[in-house]
């Protein structure tokens, strides 16, 4: 929720709609408070650990979070309506930065970027917890433009509100973390992050991690923006807005750091340069 709010606020800033820009940040702030209430942090939460989560959630905190979500639900729709029915917003967003479903598949677009171009795919569908225990649906739109990507995030916020309420109402008792032994070998996992599918690939010797690679959604989404969305934009202003609609995390595209047994480090960045660090 907080990620989609800041993504849409950035888009509204790019199309010079200061009012909705500020409203998005206004709606996001209580969500940040809820995150801090649960985890102790607002950005780098450090909540998930191997085998579960770091600590249990107190009932009073869950009640407070439920109320925050309920308050958001009550005032949320009027701001979405401002975007849906605003003629100037439509002028800056509809038929701008278009990407077809075919191009989205070819470029491997993920998350709201792919779903905004007609790809009905969400990694959460593949996880039995989401699929079997929660009432939710995959949000997608077929237009493939800046408007579709922004509305896709708005609609996904609505689904996230539904999921959070169900989690709080049905959270089971028991341990919050399993005691596990990590075997030697290789494993991979995919999850649905706010910007789309994120993949983890790790190799261990049974004690230490020897190799880990993380493929973030911005790698594919920034790529399809340049290849397809920006090809037919009419103005520089539309190009800026289209780039913002992708919700790019440039830092996420930094690729890998390799440590060898001698302690030497090679750092490969997004420009494919290599630095040897002492």
Where on the chain are the PLM-derived regions?
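Active-site bordering "gate/hinge" segments
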Residues: 1-278
